[in-house]
Amino acid sequence: MIEHHPTTIYGTTIVTVRKGNKVVIAGDGQVSLGNTVMKGNARKVRRIGKGNVIAGFAGATADAFTLLERLEAKLEQYPDQLMRASVELAKDWRTDRYLRKLEAMMLVADSKVTLALTGTGDVLEPEHGVMAIGSGGNYALAAARALVDTDKSAEEIARKAMDIAADICIYTNHNIIVESLDAE
């Protein structure tokens, strides 16, 4: 569980949907410092590696960037092996005293697999092709799960889930960034 401190930058919602031949990660743009919105258009979803991996991060911003950089380094070490790179990052996360204190989570996906990298060094695969993290993660997850069996596309589901989360969660806004990849 991520504790909220008034002097730490927090807040976001990230959702991933894998459906049909697409995988999507969507996130909002709000950065909060305590109970103040510091920025509304942050980009917390992006392509990494050679552009064949998409990632979204939630939690303390500086910590999330540290983890993103570490994952990119692991992807260089293990090209086109997202699962292996993520497991190796998780090993480092659990054993490194500095990394263990990082308060962030990430959702990552390539054409084959979607994973959540948690603050405790766990690597999890989603059930039903849907997963969400962050302050509005539970709202986005519930919305996406409700829509995944409809005829909506992965991107439509992710956007609607983010809209619902932004309506409910004060740390999430409607400035939605979406990245997608073709899935196998």
From Swiss-Prot:
Annotated positions binding Na(+): 166, 169, 172
Enzyme class, spelled out: hydrolase
This protein's UniProt keywords: Allosteric enzyme, Cytoplasm, Hydrolase, Metal-binding, Protease, Sodium, Threonine protease
Active-site positions on this chain: 12
Gene3D superfamilies hit by this protein: Glutamine Phosphoribosylpyrophosphate, subunit 1, domain 1
Regulation of catalytic or functional activity: Allosterically activated by HslU binding.
GO MF, any single term: threonine-type endopeptidase activity
Compartments where located: Cytoplasm
Superkingdom as given in the UniProt entry: Bacteria
EC numbers, comma separated: 3.4.25.2
Biological role stated in the UniProt entry: Protease subunit of a proteasome-like degradation complex believed to be a general protein degrading machinery.
Subunit structure: A double ring-shaped homohexamer of HslV is capped on each side by a ring-shaped HslU homohexamer. The assembly of the HslU/HslV complex is dependent on binding of ATP.
HAMAP family documented for this protein: HslV
Protein name: ATP-dependent protease subunit HslV
Organism: Brucella anthropi (strain ATCC 49188 / DSM 6882 / CCUG 24695 / JCM 21032 / LMG 3331 / NBRC 15819 / NCTC 12168 / Alc 37) (Ochrobactrum anthropi)
